[in-house]
Amino acid sequence: MMMNRQQIDSLVQQMNVATATGEVNLRVQQIVVRLLGDLFQAIEDLNMSQTELWKGLEYLTDAGQANELGLLAAGLGLEHYLDLRADEADAKAGITGGTPRTIEGPLYVAGAPESVGFARMDDGSESAHVDALIIEGNVTDTAGQIIPNAKVEIWHANSLGNYSFFDKSQSAFNLRRSIFTDTQGQYIAQTTMPVGYGCPPEGTTQALLNLLGRHGNRPSHVHYFVSAPGYRKLTTQFNIEGDKYLWDDFAFATRDGLIATALDVTDLAKIKQYNLNKAFKHIKFNFQLVQDADQVPLQRLIVVE
């Protein structure tokens, strides 16, 4: 049976609108009807078989059970598309400036320990074999005025490319902190050098990427939420210069303005200044926040009680 779009839309309406007997969430109904119509049209256009359809549903079930749907959304470019869409909305509204946004990814956890000005992020478990890293910078508005008491939430992977909470071998909130900027708008984080990571090689995301002929690797990076009263919350990250996947990020997160250089510091006075006892890496990364707008996208949160 071949259907045209008018017939498809009529069928979807019959099955999912006309059958309603209870209170309807009109927005959910609108989205479901549109997505089903588009899916039915794709089935017609591509002559998808029932086997292919059920295989797809089985895949989504497996991805959900593996907690990889968020990873899949990043890997297929959905998150990056939303960023581009938000950029276009800003441009149309005449909103300019500010640190570029980029994807959140699926590995944020709310509730990290808070401090003012400075925080040590790592638990010391990798100190003997991984370079220490100092990340510091300032938070200002687009005119360069400092923003004290801005909340800088930071999280990144360890030297194996794993994140605490998702990697049960790490201590709680390892490499996760919330730092409120000091009176000069500054934050300083002492941590360890992260590395990039790949999708689980036997996981559902990599399985689909294999069928598309794509790799599933990310460059070394550090995630941020930056927020302050009166300003739009910024979701972003920087990728570290020199990584082979810097401009070949499977999640499409690398953007101009979001590339950081990790400098080697061997000067003894500098080492002492940061209360360290050996050479370390140093990254300077500043943020500019845009004044608040009427609508700010909500963030997904994993809340740990």
From Swiss-Prot:
Factors inducing expression: By phenol and benzoate.
Keyword entries, A-Z: Aromatic hydrocarbons catabolism, Dioxygenase, Iron, Metal-binding, Oxidoreductase
Gene behind this protein: catA
Superkingdom to which the source organism belongs: Bacteria
Needed cofactors: Fe(3+)
Biological processes annotated in GO: beta-ketoadipate pathway; catechol-containing compound catabolic process
Similarity comment text for this entry: Belongs to the intradiol ring-cleavage dioxygenase family.
Protein name per the record: Catechol 1,2-dioxygenase
Originating species: Acinetobacter guillouiae
Cofactor annotation comment: Binds 1 Fe(3+) ion per subunit.
UniProt xrefs under Gene3D superfamilies: Aromatic compound dioxygenase
EC number: 1.13.11.1
Substrates-to-products reaction catalysed: catechol + O2 = cis,cis-muconate + 2 H(+)
Pathway annotation: Aromatic compound metabolism; beta-ketoadipate pathway; 5-oxo-4,5-dihydro-2-furylacetate from catechol: step 1/3
Residues holding Fe cation: Y163, Y197, H221, H223
Subunit structure: Homodimer.
Pfam families for this protein: Dioxygenase_C, Dioxygenase_N
Entry-linked InterPro entries: Catechol_dOase_N, Cchol_dOase_prob, Intradiol_dOase_C, Intradiol_dOase_core, Intradiol_RC_Dioxygenase
MF terms (GO), sorted A to Z: catechol 1,2-dioxygenase activity; ferric iron binding
